[in-house]
Amino acid sequence: TGDSKGQHHFLDTSLYEKSILATWKKLNLPKLPLICLTQSHECNNKSSLIHMFKTLNGKYLINSSGEINFEKINSFFKHNNSPIVFAGTALAFLELIKNSSNINIELPNGSWVLETGGYKGMKKSVNKDTFYAEISELFNLPIDKIINEYSMTELSSQFYSFGLNHTHKSAHWLKAKVVIPGKNTEAQDGEKGILAIYDLANLGSSVAIMTGDIAIKKGNEFELVGRDETLTPRGCSLAAEELISRHI
């Protein structure tokens, strides 16, 4: 799947859904209502990210056309007093930041933000440190309450990290190696390379995936750096940006 939009053909999605729920439980991720800055599964049933949010019983704040409805967002947060996980693609959150004068969002104490999809798009890109600082300021949220979900269409499982400069963790059936490009050897501790991922939940498809993402080896884990800039940008943020751009 070398195009900007990948494909992953499942016999059925039951194992994918079990992997999502088991990983969430194993990593003790927040047991809170999930509010999603995406379309609903009924509007977009081809997105692995939206299917993940559906599996986690998410509620959605972007309408069927893909437009961010600031009035709907403001209304939800005005009437919500309970902690939540506010989830979406990085580029959808960037759109909120850009339009911060149009929104009045106060996340209740105990809330989290979950972002995913990468920070580089067709029209915009951002440094992760800057992005997290802006998220923290917009929502009055400590940076260590921001979760990054790292996965891709080609995988059935997910990695998660908390805040900045922390390694990504997952369940025991998902492993990653940081590989030196062109040498086919594993990087030394602290060394950069390309991520190779092995997902045993990929029953019926490829267990081993060579990504185009750069990471630093940290023991048996890794710290994600970002996509190799010489390669075509990919990720859920691109799909979100494409939808949002139609209404700008």
What is each residue range found by the language model?
Residues I20, L49, L96-S100:
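Hydrophobic packing residues within well-ordered alpha-helices of enzyme cores
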Residues S14-S19, H51, T130-A133:
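A general alpha-helical scaffold signature found inside nucleotide-binding enzyme cores
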Residues N45-N57:
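Hydrophobic alpha-helical segments in the ANL/AMP-binding
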Residues Y16, N45, A92-E95:
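Short phosphate-engaging motifs
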